[in-house]
Amino acid sequence: MVLSAADKNNVKGIFTKIAGHAEEYGAETLERMFITYPPTKTYFPHFDLSHGSAQIKGHGKKVVAALIEAANHIDDIAGTLSKLSDLHAHKLRVDPVNFKLLGQCFLVVVAIHHPAALTPEVHASLDKFLCAVGTVLTAKYR
């Protein structure tokens, strides 16, 4: 998926609002995903999946930090997320569909916290960006 210059600007703009909330938004995203899509819990059998758990907050922070890093290097998402792609494909063996589910939940969290900023154009750009991230994270499954 090709991101236009406008898409890149929209993504960078929304991530400036997200950057200070990585743990909070990440935890909300994971909790929403686990509730909405219960099979995604199978990858976290050792986690305390209760609301507000330190493990959910910690992993959520890592997830959003990776998205921030990808947004900061939007012209080289593949290079930026290469090690993460290897980890998920070869060691963790996460079902690729879960990246799409996570992206949908992240969009909802962004919409809840920044409704005015998530214009239709920004929404479309962020969705394209999350699809690009998902494509990169699943590229090494092939």
Curated annotation (Swiss-Prot):
* One GO-annotated biological process of the protein: hydrogen peroxide catabolic process
Q: Globin domain spans which residues?
A: 2-142
Give an example GO cellular component term for this record. Answer: hemoglobin complex
Question: What domain of life?
Answer: Eukaryota
Tell me which UniProt keywords the record has, alphabetically. Answer: Heme, Iron, Metal-binding, Oxygen transport, Transport
The residues that hold O2 are: 59
Q: In which tissues is it expressed?
A: Red blood cells.
User: Where do transmembrane segments lie in this chain?
Assistant: none
Record GO terms (molecular function) = haptoglobin binding; heme binding; iron ion binding; organic acid binding; oxygen binding; oxygen carrier activity; peroxidase activity
Write out the coiled-coil annotation as residue ranges: none
Residues bound to heme b: 88
* Quaternary organization: Heterotetramer of two alpha chains and two beta chains.
Please report which protein family the annotation says this sequence is part of.
Belongs to the globin family.
Its function?
A: Involved in oxygen transport from the lung to the various peripheral tissues.
Under which name does UniProt file this protein? Answer: Hemoglobin subunit alpha-A
Query: What organism is recorded for this protein?
Result: Meleagris gallopavo (Wild turkey)
Q: Which gene encodes it?
A: HBAA
